Every structure is written in C-alpha cells, then in structure tokens.
Amino acid sequence: MKKTLSIILAAVLTLSLVLSFASCGQGSSDDKKSSLTVAVPNDTTNEARALLLLQQQGLIKLKDGVGITATVLDIEENPHNIKFNEVEAAQLPNVLKDVDYAVINSNYAIAANLNPAKDALVIEGSSSAYSNIVAVKEGNENDPLVKALVAALSSKKVADFITEKYSGSVVSVVDNPGDGFDSSVDYASLSGKTVSVAASPAPHAEILAVAKDILAEKNIKLDIQEFSDYVVPNNVVEDGTVLANYFQHKPYLDDFNAENNTHIVSVAAIHVEPLGLYGGKQSSLDALKG
C-alpha cells in the first residue's frame, strides 16, 4: 500500500513539475509582450487624450463613457499587454530612450528637437478638440490689452507663421485671420503700455514673438515670460503677476480650475498641437501590432 502511495505521489509531483515548466514557458511569452512599455502624461486631461489616441489605433479599449477623464484604470481591454508608465508631461522626451514608446505633447516634442509631423509613429488629426488658448483671470476678458493681444495672435501673419514654421506639427485654428488689430480697441491709449504673457518656450513663445512685432506697431510692449511646466503659468495669472497665459488647452484649464479653485477663463483659441506616439526602443508599431 505504501509502495502504491509512493508511486502515486511521485506521479503527481512529476505532473506538477511538467505543468509548472509549461506554465513558465507560457508566462515568458506573456512577459515578452508585457515588457513593451508606453509612457503617457500623468495629468488627467493629457493622460486621457493619450489613451484615446491609443484606443483609436486599436491598441486598447477604454470603458464606455470615460472620455476625457480616462486613466489607465479605465482600460477595459489591453490585448497587447502594454505596461503604462505615467510621467510628468514635460519629462516624456527625457524618458523616451528608456521606454518602448511615449505619447508626447507637441510643444515638448518640438522643444526636444522632435518633428511631430515626421517623427511621430501616430499623430492626432488637426481637428483635435484640444485647441491651445489664451487665458486670463476672470474679469479681465475685456481688458483692452487682452483684446489687443488676442487680435495679434489671431492675425493672418501669425497663422501663416504657424503653417510655414511647423508644417503640420502645429496647426492654426483661427477661422478668419485678421490684420492683427481690433477695431474696438483704442490703441492710442495703450501706447507705451506692456502686456505680460506666460508661455511655454515652444511653440507658444515662438508664436508670441510674431504677435510681439504686431503689437510693437502700436507701441505696445509684449513681455513674454517662459515657463517649462503646466502649473506656474496658471498660478501667475491667478495671482495677477501676469495678465495672460498661452500654453494650455481648454480641457486642461477646466480641470486645473476645478482642482485648484482658480478662476481663469479662455478668451481665444489659437492653435492645436496634435499629440503623437513616438518610438523609443522601438522604431515602428510592429512590436505592438505583431
């Protein structure tokens, strides 16, 4: 009886080992897939935007109805076993070499010498709802300096600059570009005054440089203050340090106001920066779609 029991136990142990090795072999295949990492922005609106871009490519499926509030926790289907790294948006170009792919905002891509129109493996269409805006503290919407700034940024000169400079990496969304001036503004009364604007270095500060020349025609000085993050430009508008900012899209502003109890409003949409998926360790989408 003991001999029979020993034989049975030996058989069970052998079978268990075989199954364990088989399982390990299967796990290595899954691990190979799961080793593919995609870095995405860690702020609410840009993370959702990145995930929606990946969903459009059939790489993931999000829960119904999550929209612009989606996070990695809302991924319902992940057939390619993608591992997501949530990274501060400004740092995404810096981590690109350490991950397989990264979804990067165009302003940070451009600042890192990437060309979104050429280097992105996947890019949003120019009809993206995430237009970059000029924003001011509530109550300053009708300030003549704000109106003068908006008119300059909404000019044909600026729209043409965007088209020529960025070749589709940044796209003007101004429907009817004007001559750069607002007929309702008394420019003579603004002569010698300064309008201060917080902006990211690229492309916003570059675009503002064109508007600066337009305002200079009316002897208005444009003080462009550059920031490399997504928080300070709103804080300095809220506390009155600067009059306006130009660096963000409307969904981000709405989320920022809700989280920080700030009172900043959009006064004009100027351009859109299509979000792109860039290759880091991978040079194509083959590893994701294979």
Outline where the language-model segments fall.
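Bacterial lipoprotein signal-peptidase II cleavage site
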Residues: L19-K33
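Short, polar/charged alpha-helical segment
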Residues: A48, L52-I60, D64-L73, P201-E226, ...
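Periplasmic-binding protein-like
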Residues: A48-L51, Q55, L145, A151-V174
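Short helix-initiation/N-cap motifs at beta->coil->alpha
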Residues: V66-N94, I224-N235
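Ligand-binding "clamshell"
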Residues: D98, A111-I123, D255-V267
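A bilobed periplasmic-binding-protein/Venus flytrap-type ligand-binding module shared by bacterial periplasmic
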Residues: Y130-A148, P274-A287
